[in-house]
C-alpha cells in the first residue's frame, strides 16, 4: 500500500472518512465524514473563521445552495464553468481529456485548448482505459448540476458551483451593514457542487464539497498601497510565477523561487499588495492547521488558464504522496467583474459612494425631464428611465446629448428595456458642481479554500509511522480528541476517578475520551492513530497522592502532575 491507501484505511477504521452510499455500491465523487472526521473538518473551518472573522474583521453570511439560472448566466458560469470531455466510441465511457492525457504521457496539460488536447490524444494514440476503444473528438462539458424550482420545471436553476455568488447578490445589503464604507469583507462557508466527468482521485476530487470563501471589497485605487501589507511584507514564500512556468530552460526545482512578498510585488511577480496580503493570510492559516511547510508552494495561473473573472490568481498548492501538487486555495483578483455583471443583468445599482480627499469643482450635465411627455410615452417605466439617466457617466451623457443634437433621438439600453429618447423628452444643460465624492464599483480580492482537500492534506501531512506505531501528528488546533483518559486497571476506584476527570475536561470545553479496554500500550496506540496530543493515566500513585501521569503524543515523554492541575495544564498547552 502507498501512503494514500494507508491513510484511507486508517481513516475508515477510526471514523474519519467513509465512502458515501456504501451499502448500495457507492458513487465516485462522494465521501462521508465519520465522527472524528467531522470534528477534524469543523476544527479546520473554525480555525479559518478565526483568521478571517476574528483577525481580519470579515462577517459571515449563509445563502441558499440552489441558485436561479439567471444568476449564473450573469456571472458567466453557464458559458464558462466547463471541463474538456472525451467519450469512448465503443463503451461510451466519459473521461476528462486533460486527465486521461496526463495519465498516459508525462506532460502538463494546464491551459491547453481543446484542439491541443485533441492533437495530444491522436499523437500518443491514447485509448479508452476501460475497453481500449478510440475516443470521440474532445468537447466541453458544463460542470453544474441542473435542477428546477417548483413544480413543472418552469424556473431553471443549478446547485451552486461556488459560494461567492451568494455574497455578490447580497452586496447592497452587506454594504449597508458596513455603513457603505470601503474596504470590507464578507465570507461564506458551505456546500458547492461540480458534476465532475470521472472523479477518480478519492477525496481530492468530489462532486459535492465544502468551500470557505472570502470576498474583500476595495477601491481599486487602494490595491497598490494596501495598509495591512506592511505587517507581512517580509514573509518569504515559495513562488512559482507564470513567467517561470513558461521558461523551458529552468528545471522544475529552479522554477520555484523563495522570495519576500515585498520583492514579489516590487518585481511585478504578484500584481499588487492587496492580493499579496491575502496570500500571506493563507500561509498563516495553513501553518496553524498543521500543513507541512516544505509541501506548500504558491503557483500563479497562466493567462490561458485564468478564470473568466480574474485579473490575477495564485493557488496555494499542497504536495501529496500519490497525486503530487494539488490546488487547495485560490487567491484571485476578481476585479469588479461580478458586480458589473449583476448590475447589468438585474438593473440594481451595486456601486458605493466614496469621499474624495479634496472637494473640487466640475462641469457636468444636468437633465430636466418633460415628465408629462415621458410619463405618457413610457407609463410605468418612466421611473426606470429617470433612474437610468441619473446613473450615466460623463462619457455616456456626452453621447446622449450629441445624439439628440445631431439625430434628434438616442436609444438608452437598460436591463429592463430599451428606451428611445426623443429630443423633446428632456433638456440637458451644463452646470458647475462641487464634487465631494464619486460612485465606484468596488474590486474584489477573493481567497477561496477547498476545505475537503485541505482536510485530507492535514491528514496526510500528519501521518507518520515507524516500526512500533502509527501516528496522526495533528496540530493542537485541529486534533479531534484533545485528551485520552485511562484507568490503569478497572478496579480500586480508578475508573471512577478517570471518568470524573474526563467529565471535568469536557465541562471545560475539551473533547476527552475515556478508554478502559485492553493493555495501556494498546490504548496509547489507539489515541496515537487518531492524533490525540495528550493521554492521562490514573494509577496506584493517584490513589496515594492524587497525581496522574501525562503522556505527550509526539515525544512520548511521561511526567506526573497533581490531578487538580490537569485542566489548566492541558488548556494552556492547547
UniProtKB/Swiss-Prot annotation:
Residues that bind ATP: 194-196, 204-209, 327-328, 450-453
The EC number(s) this enzyme carries: 6.1.1.14
One of the record's GO cellular component terms: cytoplasm
Single GO MF annotation: glycine-tRNA ligase activity
Keyword S-adenosyl-L-methionine attributed: no
Keywords in alphabetical order: Aminoacyl-tRNA synthetase, ATP-binding, Cytoplasm, Ligase, Nucleotide-binding, Protein biosynthesis
Reactions catalysed: tRNA(Gly) + glycine + ATP = glycyl-tRNA(Gly) + AMP + diphosphate
Cellular compartments annotated: Cytoplasm
Keyword Aminoacyl-tRNA synthetase recorded: yes
GO biological process assignments: glycyl-tRNA aminoacylation
Residue positions binding substrate: 96, 162, 209-213, 446-450
Source species, domain of life: Archaea
Gene3D superfamilies xrefs: 3.30.40.230, 3.30.720.200, Anticodon-binding domain, Bira Bifunctional Protein, Domain 2
Membership in a protein family: Belongs to the class-II aminoacyl-tRNA synthetase family.
HAMAP family: Gly_tRNA_synth_A
Function: Catalyzes the attachment of glycine to tRNA(Gly).
NCBIfam families: glyS_dimeric (TIGR00389), PRK04173.1 (NF003211)
Protein known as: Glycine--tRNA ligase
Organism per entry: Methanococcus maripaludis (strain DSM 14266 / JCM 13030 / NBRC 101832 / S2 / LL)
Gene that this sequence comes from: glyS
